[in-house]
Amino acid sequence: VGEVKTKQAPVFETVEKTPAPNKATLYETADIAPVGTPEQFYLPETVPVIQSLAVLILSAEAPISRNALVHKLIGAWGITRSGDRTDKVLADVFRMIDKRITIDENNAFFWLGKQNPDTYDIYRPADIQGNKRELTEIPSEEIISAVTEVLSEQIGLSRADLIRETAKKF
């Protein structure tokens, strides 16, 4: 009688796929109350107040488009449209603030001085009330973060599907 050999079941290596960390976070907005009148905005003694308000907004919302920052700042003084006079005041204020600036197409984005656009890896789809920003108000660094999240969730997408899935994030 021959020897009986029992076969061992093959052992396969398994790889556990860990879910990618969610890069989405709420878009925090600065709660801005009216500060003064349009006439007061242009007074030299108002510059430190404008600067403080700009820093407050940047601390909550950076990266933020220059247009959105300007709109919030002048709105605090009841000004609805920017012009040469407001641009001059704000140019002086912006020179005094510790910030970084990136340009996407024709849109400038202001970052806190301590934020590094090269390592920024989150995206902010909406604020706590569900309000969403226009595409022109979202820096490319946030869009890139959303794209990398989509690619980690779904490998092998066509370009059209990647664009659609990324757009759903916002």
Residues of each region from the PLM?
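C-terminal non-catalytic scaffold/interaction domains in large multidomain proteins
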Residues: 1-170
